[in-house]
UniProtKB/Swiss-Prot annotation:
Its main location: membrane. Keywords: ATP synthesis, ATP-binding, Cell inner membrane, Cell membrane, CF(1), Hydrogen ion transport, Ion transport, Membrane, Nucleotide-binding, Translocase, Transport. It holds the Pfam family ATP-synt_ab_N. HAMAP family: ATP_synth_alpha_bact (MF_01346). Produces ATP from ADP in the presence of a proton gradient across the membrane. The alpha chain is a regulatory subunit. Belongs to the ATPase alpha/beta chains family. It is an enzyme of class 7 (translocase). This is ATP synthase subunit alpha. The lineage of its organism: Bacteria, Pseudomonadati, Pseudomonadota, Betaproteobacteria, Burkholderiales. F-type ATPases have 2 components, CF(1) - the catalytic core - and CF(0) - the membrane proton channel. CF(1) has five subunits: alpha(3), beta(3), gamma(1), delta(1), epsilon(1). CF(0) has three main subunits: a(1), b(2) and c(9-12). The alpha and beta chains form an alternating ring which encloses part of the gamma chain. CF(1) is attached to CF(0) by a central stalk formed by the gamma and epsilon chains, while a peripheral stalk is formed by the delta and b chains.
Length: 513
């Protein structure tokens, strides 16, 4: 039998074409070890820093350490089923979370999954968890206020839209209470809020959610929860996830407020991951890049100009600036603000509200130390009427604290010193405020006006808050036009000032407090 070479080659070609083998090039590696949520993977030569990795059972990991012969990855979620020899694939993607108005009113995990039992969230968009902060040219100076509704803050340490204001203090000094009050006070002001709970007890988070719901604040708030039972990786990523959700509003010409509660626990989680990845420890065993951990997060809070918003939205939104205001919380140990993480965050932020244990225990709540609490944005972002009336409050309080310490040792005090001490006691009393009871601008203005003009000087200290409450009720019932004008203009004209003085004098004569 004679074989024709051309027939043989044709036969081989047809067989090859029928095979239909698809060749896929894939970057794949093998698990060498897995301990405490950290996987060492051999291979993956083309992996990128921060890239998502796919483990068996659709488990996701994050490549953090790129070494010569292995990759150190942190597993997001359950890792007990991963074993030595398991295959690991590169995804070529960076971690993303869902964003959009659909998240408002919901409690979500770090990766944007609903955990409040209210059904699925149908978001249309996702965005990267790590993003570069807006540049200098894209920013606009901070000039609009974020009213917290707390007299002590709005009068002495005003916060502006796009500012980063640190809330710092020991445990149990009311840090979360200040932040939650600020969120509650944004009702009807067009500010969307994000509350990021990092490493807290689940019961504490549930309590915050309940309070927000009771006060009607949950409708414009996203709660991102990474409780103490979550892995260190989730606690570390939670702040960035919340920031991305807040940036959605900022970049579209809206105003947003984000609370990180608290960044000390985030730094501890990052330290845990870094030590498990065998990175060299530095001061207090934190890794060398713990400053960058917080600076790249807090720099994303900014006020962006109208050009940036217009360019981002492809011309859909014109003439509107956007802002993301950050209220990071730091917990200190025995008032030590010179520890590593507190000093880092103080140097990054635009001011700090310092809460003191001694003041808290003395019944001054919020327990704000007026002497060392500052806002580096200052009066530029303050409401006109509050700016006009709050000038003397801070100095009165600072001088009072100084004199009070001195007066303990002095037996006979001159008249001027005694007057200053008496005034200081009344101003301190006036700065006290009940939790979840933020004040409107006109209420604050009335209180500040009364204390500045000496209407409290002849009252007993214990009657100060009762007088304030009575004055507010009196103004609301008999001077509704004046109240409406102050609230609308956020200013105090000469005529309104005269009317306010007459109203306060009228109330004081009635002596119904």
């Amino acid at each position: 039998m004679q074989l024709n070479p051309s027939e043989i080659s044709e036969l081989i070609k047809s067989r090859i074409s029928e095979l239909g083998v698809d060749s896929q090039v894939r970057n794949e590696g093998t698990v060498i070890s897995v301990t405490d949520g950290i996987c060492r993977v051999h291979g993956l030569s083309g992996v990128m820093q921060g890239e998502m990795l796919e483990f068996p059972n659709n488990t996701i990991g994050l490549a953090l350490n790129l070494e010569r012969d292995s990759v150190g990855a942190v597993v997001l979620g359950e890792y007990t089923h991963i074993k030595e020899g398991d295959p690991v694939k590169c995804t070529g993607r960076i971690l993303e979370v869902p964003v959009g108005p659909e998240l408002l009113g919901r409690v979500v995990s770090v990766l944007g999954q609903p955990i409040d039992g209210k059904g699925p969230i149908n978001t249309k968009l996702t965005d990267f968890i790590e993003k570069v902060a807006p540049g200098v040219i894209a920013r606009q100076s901070v000039s609009q206020p974020v009213q917290t509704g707390l007299k002590a803050i709005d009068a002495m340490v005003p916060i502006g839209r796009g500012q980063r204001e640190l809330i710092i203090g020991d445990r149990q000094t009311g840090k979360t209470a200040v932040a939650v009050d600020a969120i509650i006070n944004q009702k009807g002001k067009g500010v969307y809020c994000v509350y990021v709970a990092i490493g807290q007890k689940a019961s504490t988070i549930a309590n915050v959610v309940r309070k927000l719901t009771e006060n009607g604040a949950i409708d414009y708030t996203i709660v991102v929860a990474a409780s103490a039972s979550e892995s260190a990786a989730m606690q570390y990523l939670s702040a960035y996830a919340g920031c991305t959700m807040g940036e959605y509003f900022r970049d579209r010409g809206e105003d947003a407020l984000i609370v990180y509660d608290d960044l000390t626990k985030q730094a501890v989680a990052y330290r845990q991951i870094s030590l498990l990845l065998r990175r060299p420890p530095g001061r207090e065993a934190y890794p060398g890049d713990v400053f960058y951990l917080h600076s790249r997060l807090l720099e994303r809070a900014a006020r962006v100009n109208a050009e940036y918003v217009e360019k981002f939205t492809n011309g859909a939104v014109k003439g509107k600036t956007g802002s993301l205001t950050a209220l990071p919380i730091i917990e200190t140990q025995a008032g030590d603000v010179s520890a590593f993480v507190p000093t880092n965050v103080i140097s990054i932020t635009d001011g700090q509200i310092f809460l003191e244990t001694d003041l808290f225990n003395a019944g001054v709540r919020p327990a704000i130390n007026a002497g060392i609490s500052v806002s580096r944005v200052g009066g530029t972002a303050q409401t006109k009427v509050i700016k006009k009336l709050s000038g003397g409050i801070r100095t009165d309080l600072a001088q009072y604290r100084e004199l009070a310490a001195f007066a303990q040792f002095a037996s006979d005090l001159d008249e001027a010193t005694r007057k200053q001490l008496e005034r200081g006691r009344r101003v301190t009393e006036l700065c006290k405020q009940a939790q979840y009871k933020p004040l409107q601008v006109w209420e604050m203005a009335a209180s500040l006006y009364a204390v500045n003009n000496g209407f409290f000087d002849d009252l007993e200290v214990k009657n100060v808050l009762a007088f304030e409450k009575g004055l507010q009720d009196h103004l609301k019932s008999k001077y509704a036009d004046l109240v409406a004008r102050i609230e609308a203009t956020k200013d105090l004209s000469k005529d309104d000032e005269a009317a306010l003085r007459a109203a306060v004098e009228d109330y004081k004569r009635s002596a119904s407090f």
